[in-house]
Amino acid sequence: MKRAFILVLDSFGIGATADAQAFGDVGSDTLGHIADQCAQGLADNAERKGALQLPNLSKLGLAMAHKESTGRFAPGLDERADIIGAYAHAAELSSGKDTPSGHWEIAGVPVLFEWGYFSDKQNSFPKELTDRILARAGLDGFLGNCHASGTQVLDDLGEEHMRTGKPIFYTSADSVFQIACHEETFGLARLLELCQIAREELADYNIGRVIARPFVGPGKGQFARTGNRRDLSVEPPSATVLQKLVEEKQGRVVSIGKIADIYAYCGITDKVKATGIPDLFEATLEQIKQAGDNTIVFTNFVDFDSAYGHRRDVAGYAAALEYFDKRLPEVLALMQEDDILILTADHGCDPTWPGTDHTREHIPVLVYGKKVAPGSLGRRDTFADIGQTLASYFGTSPMDYGKNFL
């Protein structure tokens, strides 16, 4: 019975890539810098203290993959762990360092074209675009029109939004158009309708995602995003390994978290909603228990990126990693004879790095299975090696990019 479980620790980079200079990210290292700050006592909070402790990830080869990427061991990680999995560090072939590019490449389809971007920090959006969106939505104005941190923009504009009913439009260094609205005063359904209008009006701009950012709270300092985020992505430019499994093998692909949104529902047969790392983990365990032959269970743990990476919260990121690590044996205990588990990431988001954007880094590729030989798989030239490996494993037609590493 063929089953594969892909767990994406969103933003968990393990050291800058050779092309990081083009992105302003030379020296970035999400894992290494978190470990450094933990070792120095600079990442203590109510949940954790001291050196970074990731014994189970280290057994799967995380410490070794990081060393092969950066030339050094991350302090606190067990460099003498008995390795039980295959491990690698992978570079990105895609032109960007964004979520769709990383995920599509993982599934065998790198993004070799250039996304459209809203590069101006202020007055970011063309007036003709926003005029069309507002007219179709029956709105008389909007707030923002800038690059912004998703949490800061709520403090800056949330109260005015509640008072005026004007949505908050903002963007970032990624190919995104983001809309933040209060779930209670503006309405969630209305926000999602507005995002659909924006998605349609952005057809000629080559923007990767429109993101609905609903929030709640009475006022500044008390606003909080909810779990009802939606990502409206464009479709991948060609068939991913997910689509091939479904179409060629009549297989199942179970999306947990925002996976379905990222792939614009292409190649997704089942969607499980869960928010927050504990709930995402529980949903993953439940779906592994239920999974039959020719099934991929695919989970994105977005909080590593959204709650800790972008917010530059080193202690929070470290605590979340340690929580994930402690629960990892629960996944391993459910593995059957022919199963494959792949732990990976889609880009970096170094919480010690200037700004709030992603970082261009290698991703870990940690592979475990009872029939997987432990040891180094070296440096992989593209995330698409994961997709090609899955294509070979499930017996679908091969992908155009990537090499099978098993």
Curated annotation (Swiss-Prot):
InterPro entries according to UniProt: Alkaline_phosphatase_core_sf, DeoB, Metalloenzyme, Phosphopentomutase_DeoB_cap_sf
Cofactor names: Mn(2+)
Reactions this protein catalyses: 2-deoxy-alpha-D-ribose 1-phosphate = 2-deoxy-D-ribose 5-phosphate; alpha-D-ribose 1-phosphate = D-ribose 5-phosphate
Main location: cytoplasm
Localization (cell): Cytoplasm
GO CC list: cytosol
Domain of life: Bacteria
Biological process (GO), any one: nucleotide metabolic process
Transmembrane segments: none
The protein's annotated pathway: Carbohydrate degradation; 2-deoxy-D-ribose 1-phosphate degradation; D-glyceraldehyde 3-phosphate and acetaldehyde from 2-deoxy-alpha-D-ribose 1-phosphate: step 1/2
EC number: 5.4.2.7
Co-factor note (free text): Binds 2 manganese ions.
Keywords, in A-Z order: Cytoplasm, Isomerase, Manganese, Metal-binding
Enzyme class: isomerase
GO terms for MF: magnesium ion binding; manganese ion binding; phosphopentomutase activity
Binding site for Mn(2+) 2: 305, 310, 358
Residues annotated for Mn(2+) 1 binding in this entry: 10, 346-347
Its job: Isomerase that catalyzes the conversion of deoxy-ribose 1-phosphate (dRib-1-P) and ribose 1-phosphate (Rib-1-P) to deoxy-ribose 5-phosphate (dRib-5-P) and ribose 5-phosphate (Rib-5-P), respectively.
Similarity comment: family membership: Belongs to the phosphopentomutase family.
Protein name as it appears in the record: Phosphopentomutase
Source species: Vibrio cholerae serotype O1 (strain ATCC 39541 / Classical Ogawa 395 / O395)
Gene name of the record: deoB
